[in-house]
């Protein structure tokens, strides 16, 4: 009797453990908060009680969270998050801009590598552009960008209906432009922001030659360099490449 009870108890504990593990895995997969928590920690962001900074912080985080996420739309949860993680924001301009930039750049580059020659690739690109458009719509800046995209004569409702499938570069260029405008909106006086803007230009140039991104070793290195912080005074990737080509010709 005792042995059977122990077996039942072991089974019950295992069952509960498996259920809880599945719940945890589901939560981890459905949220990107952990990734952004690491990014904020790296940037050593500290937020004080200035309401304007708080609003900018929430807008920036909402911009990066999944479209279905309503974490920061509830004031109580927002306050609890700030208290629990002791996140304080001294200066939103350089740090948050860098985080948002790096996140969207990774998303944009992943879009550029989707093969649109088959049906699955087209469907994937359509879903991803729709998802990213929802992210852009999460902030005041995003709403402005969204309306501008919808009213564009080259393709109204490009993101809303996933019609960017036939012209993926057109959609990707919009996102590169949106990142640049986000950085300008956050303040162009910061050296970090200027450096980030230079990297956006390098990304936009690289995306213009998709074959080079996929085939050229030099282009792959350029993509990696995009994520390395650089001083504004240093030459950009594009200028390095042009000077190298000139020296080769001579």
Curated annotation (Swiss-Prot):
The annotated regions of Basic and acidic residues compositional bias extend over: 207-226
Organism superkingdom:
Eukaryota
Compositional bias (Low complexity) spans?
233-250
Any one cellular component term from GO for this entry? Answer: chloroplast
> What main location does UniProt list?
plastid
Task: Indicate where this protein resides in the cell.
Answer: Plastid, Chloroplast
Give UniProt keywords alphabetically. Chloroplast, Plastid
Q: Where is this region: Disordered?
A: 207-250
UniProt protein name:
Uncharacterized 28.3 kDa protein in rrn23-psbC intergenic region
The upper taxonomy is: Eukaryota, Viridiplantae, Chlorophyta, core chlorophytes, Trebouxiophyceae
